[in-house]
Amino acid sequence: MTEKLGILAIGHGSKLPYNKEVVSQIADYIAQKHSDVVVRAGFMENSEPTLEEAIAGFAGTGVTKIAAVPVFLASGVHITKDIPGILSLDEKGCGILNIDGKDVPLCYAKPLGADELIADLVFKRVQEAL
């Protein structure tokens, strides 16, 4: 059986539209660059789709495994407690989702964190500001 990857891009959410737009655009960029991957965006609060709704969006796609990645810079309560609770993750950051009547393994990725790519982007924004 061929593996089909799903990616759940998790955003914080906001009452203002820009947070949803940024996370959704990042999810779209991933989907455009990796056309063989099914990408969905979901949000913790104040934005839709919720995480549960985004997970339901994998129905009918044939995904055989899902990676959930928080589009956050650093760990906090949402990353360490709330999201793992919503996704019913074990202590290793793994879980099982039922999609189309099948058990689909889910793995939880780290937040973006300190990375040279982030540093390059920060420097790019500085150059744009000057």
UniProtKB/Swiss-Prot annotation:
One of its GO terms (biological process) is anaerobic cobalamin biosynthetic process. Substrate binds at E48, L73, A74, S75, G76, V77, H78. Co(2+) binds at H12, H78. It comes from the Archaea. Keywords: Cobalamin biosynthesis, Cobalt, Lyase, Metal-binding, Methanogenesis, Nickel. Its EC number is 4.99.1.3, 4.99.1.11. One of its GO terms (molecular function) is cobalt ion binding. Pathway: Cofactor biosynthesis; adenosylcobalamin biosynthesis; cob(II)yrinate a,c-diamide from sirohydrochlorin (anaerobic route): step 1/10. Homotetramer; dimer of dimers. Catalyzes the insertion of Co(2+) into sirohydrochlorin as part of the anaerobic pathway to cobalamin biosynthesis (Potential). Involved in the biosynthesis of the unique nickel-containing tetrapyrrole coenzyme F430, the prosthetic group of methyl-coenzyme M reductase (MCR), which plays a key role in methanogenesis and anaerobic methane oxidation. Catalyzes the insertion of Ni(2+) into sirohydrochlorin to yield Ni-sirohydrochlorin. Belongs to the CbiX family. CbiXS subfamily. This is Sirohydrochlorin cobaltochelatase. It comes from Methanosarcina acetivorans (strain ATCC 35395 / DSM 2834 / JCM 12185 / C2A). The lineage of its organism: Archaea, Methanobacteriati, Methanobacteriota, Stenosarchaea group, Methanomicrobia.
